[in-house]
Amino acid sequence: MEIPLQEQESSLKSSSEPSSSTSEPVVNTQGSDNQGEEILSQLYRPLEACDNKCYCKKCCYHCQLCFLKKGLGIWYDHSRKRSSKRAKVTASSASDESLSANTGDSQPTKKQKTKVETKGLTDLGPGR
């Protein structure tokens, strides 16, 4: 099962020469460099408006803006409205008054409790 010398020499020559399969990765690395530069340029480019209203997985990841809005749920468009100190003071005093009014109505007074207890003790009803 020995290979003749001519075939061995030809196989050595073909292995030392760059084949089409070895030249493809070189092209791919150059292409990937271009892709990397393109991705970086897209990263630093300002986000463009996207009017896509769909929330499916494909639409959530199709552009960076949709990913931020739909995928992560981050909205930078709305600014927070800060209320003044006066509004906080009046809101807290109004909430205190409403809480005291609600708690007074919801709990029975001591007089009502004693009436229920005495009535339960006097009325024995038919028992054993």
UniProtKB/Swiss-Prot annotation:
<feature type="compositionally biased region" description="Basic residues">
    <location>
        <begin position="79"/>
        <end position="88"/>
    </location>
</feature>
<feature type="region of interest" description="Disordered">
    <location>
        <begin position="1"/>
        <end position="37"/>
    </location>
</feature>
<keyword id="KW-0597">Phosphoprotein</keyword>
<keyword id="KW-0945">Host-virus interaction</keyword>
<comment type="function">
    <text>Extracellular circulating Tat can be endocytosed by surrounding uninfected cells via the binding to several surface receptors. Endosomal low pH allows Tat to cross the endosome membrane to enter the cytosol and eventually further translocate into the nucleus, thereby inducing severe cell dysfunctions ranging from cell activation to cell death. Through.</text>
</comment>
<keyword id="KW-0805">Transcription regulation</keyword>
<keyword id="KW-0014">AIDS</keyword>
<keyword id="KW-1048">Host nucleus</keyword>
<comment type="similarity">
    <text>Belongs to the lentiviruses Tat family.</text>
</comment>
<comment type="function">
    <text>Transcriptional activator that increases RNA Pol II processivity, thereby increasing the level of full-length viral transcripts. Recognizes a hairpin structure at the 5'-LTR of the nascent viral mRNAs referred to as the transactivation responsive RNA element (TAR) and recruits the cyclin T1-CDK9 complex (P-TEFb complex) that will in turn hyperphosphorylate the RNA polymerase II to allow efficient elongation. The CDK9 component of P-TEFb and other Tat-activated kinases hyperphosphorylate the C-terminus of RNA Pol II that becomes stabilized and much more processive.</text>
</comment>
<dbReference type="InterPro" id="IPR036963">
    <property type="entry name" value="Tat_dom_sf"/>
</dbReference>
<dbReference type="GO" id="GO:0044196">
    <property type="term" value="C:host cell nucleolus"/>
</dbReference>
<feature type="region of interest" description="Disordered">
    <location>
        <begin position="79"/>
        <end position="128"/>
    </location>
</feature>
<dbReference type="GO" id="GO:0001070">
    <property type="term" value="F:RNA-binding transcription regulator activity"/>
</dbReference>
<keyword id="KW-0010">Activator</keyword>
<dbReference type="GO" id="GO:0050434">
    <property type="term" value="P:positive regulation of viral transcription"/>
</dbReference>
<dbReference type="InterPro" id="IPR001831">
    <property type="entry name" value="IV_Tat"/>
</dbReference>
<feature type="compositionally biased region" description="Polar residues">
    <location>
        <begin position="90"/>
        <end position="109"/>
    </location>
</feature>
<comment type="subunit">
    <text>Interacts with host CCNT1. Associates with the P-TEFb complex composed at least of Tat, P-TEFb (CDK9 and CCNT1), TAR RNA, RNA Pol II. Interacts with CCNT2; the resulting complex is unable to bind to TAR RNA.</text>
</comment>
<dbReference type="Pfam" id="PF00539">
    <property type="entry name" value="Tat"/>
</dbReference>
<feature type="region of interest" description="Core">
    <location>
        <begin position="67"/>
        <end position="77"/>
    </location>
</feature>
<protein>
    <recommendedName>
        <fullName>Protein Tat</fullName>
    </recommendedName>
</protein>
<keyword id="KW-0804">Transcription</keyword>
<feature type="modified residue" description="Phosphoserine; by host CDK9">
    <location>
        <position position="92"/>
    </location>
</feature>
<feature type="short sequence motif" description="Nuclear localization signal, and RNA-binding (TAR)">
    <location>
        <begin position="78"/>
        <end position="88"/>
    </location>
</feature>
<feature type="compositionally biased region" description="Low complexity">
    <location>
        <begin position="7"/>
        <end position="24"/>
    </location>
</feature>
<dbReference type="GO" id="GO:0003723">
    <property type="term" value="F:RNA binding"/>
</dbReference>
<keyword id="KW-0694">RNA-binding</keyword>
<feature type="compositionally biased region" description="Polar residues">
    <location>
        <begin position="25"/>
        <end position="34"/>
    </location>
</feature>
<feature type="region of interest" description="Cysteine-rich">
    <location>
        <begin position="50"/>
        <end position="66"/>
    </location>
</feature>
